[in-house]
Amino acid sequence: MASTKPLSRFWEWGKNIVCVGRNYADHVKEMRSTVLSEPVLFLKPSTAYAPEGSPVLMPAYCRNLHHEVELGVLLGRRGEAVPEAAAMDYVAGYALCLDMTARDVQDECKKKGLPWTLAKSFTSSCPVSAFVPKEKIPDPHALRLWLKVNGELRQEGKTSSMIFSIPYIISYVSKIITLEEGDLILTGTPKGVGAVKENDEIEAGIDGVVSMRFKVERSKY
């Protein structure tokens, strides 16, 4: 049965935001981390969504907010233990996404062996572009992502540099978390992550596909 929910408004009804960390070797190196044999996963709540036109809110407890530009994959149907060979059949489209990160908080969490929830899952920590139908991106592993802050290029990278491919990620995640229509998977960020502050303007894009702008504001809480 076809869904009556519009994927063009996925941020209004999608349930899960599953994020993949350490999926670009150059970013792993800049973070002084280690490439692992399996994807690093963490979650964001649906209240993390910030569609274009809304601000990126810097939590009151954060003093070092970082940008991470990523390709997001939108699921078009329910999937459980999806075979890697069939994984792309579950993709409805894509979105450009930011994984906003309270880096100072994340560093403390790492030192204490704690989850990254406070650093990664706050309100508006997942700004997203308009929905891009699957047909507009024939090869999601042949894209150039970029991000600017106040007009200065900070991040750029090619999705061909992913350590784990999109089909592998979908299959891997679906064996742990049952995926639903409208769920979003963030596929990792290339090198160049860095700090933003209140009143900064973030602009990001996928060459020839989509772009978006957000302004950073300080949250009251």
Curated annotation (Swiss-Prot):
Transit peptide extent on chain: 1-24
Modified residues (Phosphoserine): S37
Presence of the UniProt keyword Zinc in the record: no
Subcellular location: Mitochondrion; Cytoplasm, Cytosol
Keywords, sorted A to Z: Acetylation, Cytoplasm, Hydrolase, Isomerase, Lyase, Magnesium, Manganese, Metal-binding, Mitochondrion, Phosphoprotein, Transit peptide
Its EC number(s): 5.3.2.2, 3.7.1.5, 4.1.1.112
Lineage: superkingdom: Eukaryota
Pfam families with a match to the protein in the record: FAA_hydrolase
Cofactor note: Requires a divalent metal cation for activity.
GO BP term, pick one: oxaloacetate metabolic process
Similarity comment: family membership: Belongs to the FAH family.
Subunit structure: Homodimer.
Protein's name in the database: Oxaloacetate tautomerase FAHD1, mitochondrial
Species per Swiss-Prot/TrEMBL record: Rattus norvegicus
Gene label: Fahd1
